[in-house]
């Protein structure tokens, strides 16, 4: 029974993201960063960034950077509009966990 509880606790849960879910930014972020409740297998994890039409933008996961509970990807310049981040990580318990969130980049102020 105790082993089963320990195994269940090992599933990775997203604790924090940058940008935050639902955020409106003045400019596109250079990186997407995710923090989980435990270690993840970065080499077998991914981040996708999709525009309003569902087209994927290049995102490069930085496998060697940061703490073992963080997944970070660099992204090319993101234009004004709504963006969806889809992530998938391999937990140290061997289970694949995925999720998504959205944020917006506000249009530039015109003079």
Regions found by a protein language model. Give the residues of each.
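N-terminal signal peptide c-region/cleavage motif recognized by signal peptidases
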Residues: 5-7
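Extracytoplasmic/periplasmic copper-protein system
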Residues: 13-15, 23, 96-111
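Contiguous beta-strand segments within globular domains
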Residues: 25-33
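A glycine-anchored, Pro-Gly-centered beta-turn/N-cap motif
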Residues: 28, 79-85
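Short, surface-exposed alpha-helix to beta-strand junction/turn motifs within ectodomains of secreted
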Residues: 33, 38-57
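Aromatic sugar-binding surface patches on proteins
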Residues: 67-72
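Short, flexible loop/turn segments at beta-strand junctions in immunoglobulin-like
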Residues: 75-77
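Short, exposed beta-strand-loop hairpins at the edges of beta-sheets
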Residues: 86-100
């Amino acid at each position: 029974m105790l082993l089963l509880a320990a195994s269940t606790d090992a599933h990775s849960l997203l604790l924090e993201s940058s940008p935050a879910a639902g955020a409106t930014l003045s400019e596109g972020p250079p990186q997407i960063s995710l923090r989980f409740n435990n270690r993840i297998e970065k080499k077998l994890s991914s981040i996708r960034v999709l525009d309003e039409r569902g087209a994927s933008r290049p995102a490069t996961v930085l496998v060697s950077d940061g703490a073992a509970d963080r997944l970070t990807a660099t992204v090319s310049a993101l234009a004004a509009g709504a963006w969806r981040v889809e992530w998938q990580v391999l937990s140290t318990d061997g289970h694949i966990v995925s999720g998504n969130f959205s944020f917006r980049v506000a249009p530039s102020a015109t003079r």
